[in-house]
Amino acid sequence: MSLEKFVDALPFPPVLKAEGTRDGIPYYEVTMKQVMQKLHRDLPPTTVWGYNGLYPGPTFEVRRNEPILVKWKNELPFEHLLPVDRTIHGAEPDKPSVRTVVHLHEGRVSPENDGHPEAWFTRDFENVGPKFVHEVYFYPNCQRPATLWYHDHTLGITRLNVYAGLAGFYLLRDEEEEELNLPSGKFEIPLVIQDRSFYPNGEWFYPTQPGHEPPPAPQPPPAIDPTLPNPSIVPEFFGNTILVNGKVWPFLEVEPRKYRFRILNGSNARFYRISFSSPDLDFTLIGTEGGLLEKKIENVSQIILAPAERVDVIVDFSNHKGQNIILTNEANAPFPDGNPPSPDLSQIMQFRVKQKLSKPDKSKVPENLSCLERLDPGDAVTVRKNVLVESTDEFGRLKNLLNNLEWDQLPITETPYNGTIEIWELYNTTPDTHPIHLHLVTFQILSRATFSGDPNNNPVIGPPLPLDPSETGWKDTVRANPGEVSRIIARFGPFTGIYPWHCHILEHEDHEMMRSFENLDNQNFNPCIPIPGVCPDDSFTQCCQDIDDDESSSDEQDESSSD
């Protein structure tokens, strides 16, 4: 349905405040609720799921090396808001319809605090999944300051829970970054971009089977395919409406000065290629998922964002007084070779530049931003070859896999040792770009190249392809493009245990494009001993106390929180 653009102001999710402390650690309680929320001037209120009853959820603002405790509480209804496919692994008929678990995306945390897909829980913790450990999560924040986010990660229904509204920002800060004097306060704004579709009554539309289109789709709707489950998962979801921070095509009034925007692609499957409608306005890139770059990159005219990717940018509106400027999108769907965006989907939000400043702009964007260690491929102890493939399930539906294996097939095939550096090669034999996300670690992208032949039998590798500016820093999600091998390098640690790695197209993730890796104990590595060349704000030594204490702290908090 067509809604008028730029009639609603951009909302700002509120910053969470701790409930108090437990053993001196700030303690938060966040409750998932079903509420009605107004998403556009001309739409009736929409039923959404929100953390603390807000879509998107409230923002955590935390400090490096200052841990917090969070009790995630499920007070959602017993029946799901969206169509649940009971043939999908993890969502079988014997499982409760509504299950939740929260993943702190890019959090350097132990496995029991990671939000494992099978650590789900139901309302009031009445039922829990096989990997559930405790009610209170311990986040040590022993990592670089960065733009993290939190979202649902429940096996088999992640796509539905996130679509319903379960996502929010988690901003990690420190004094060194604040001393840079980047734009801050009301001039630092997180933006989460998502696509959705609506029924005329304001409710979310999500397809019940492949081929079902949102209103105003042709009437009558297509017949139910009797050869498929009903409801059935779809290969990917692409909405016909863009929301930013939970508002449909919003506007933001800005002053003629520098702003800092932390931009997250929070969509299920849609990619964005963002730029500005004014050709002389561009981005200064200062950070990616894993925090600030070593040096700023100026004059960036466009940025590609896959689902889960983030960028940290400065935009200077000083020379655009009185102008209305559109943040635009040129990405095809599916990416990269699908349909170009419609006129509606080529617009994201509007910036209305005022004539005057409220106060002088004293913020700066220094040339040098942070210490950034470059991992040396020569230090890698293993090069792992991973192949992305297309398959079909028992109903003939498209099913993408990692190494032709499903989520729970044993043995676990990726088994790095704690503290070691590995190179992972991602060979994509499918026609789509897949955003591949590894839990626990951040990594760097070494190279991309085309390949031909069998990836498992001496493929022919072409020359390296240029990386985008937004791929030069620490990452937690890499775009594995079709017909290419993407090479990433990571130091695994500091926690040991089992973590997921997966495609962050949520329909793919829910339909088996997810595997586990196990970070194994390494008797030759002590995370409390500094590694030469590692930047202080990224050192594993920040976490060494937490490695011993986090589980016991969380268990103690579970006991006290149930008093």
Residue ranges and their predicted role:
Residues 30, 70, 102, 152, ...:
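Divalent metal-coordination and catalytic microenvironments
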Residues 189-190, 194-196, 200-201, 207, ...:
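Peripheral, solvent-exposed domain-edge segments
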Residues 1-128, 134-136, 219-261, 266, ...:
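N-terminal, post-signal-peptide metal-ligating segments of extracellular/periplasmic oxidoreductases
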Residues 552-554, 560-562:
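Ser/Thr/Pro-rich low-complexity tandem-repeat tracts
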Residues 278-292, 429-470, 496, 506-509, ...:
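Active/binding-pocket-proximal capping segment
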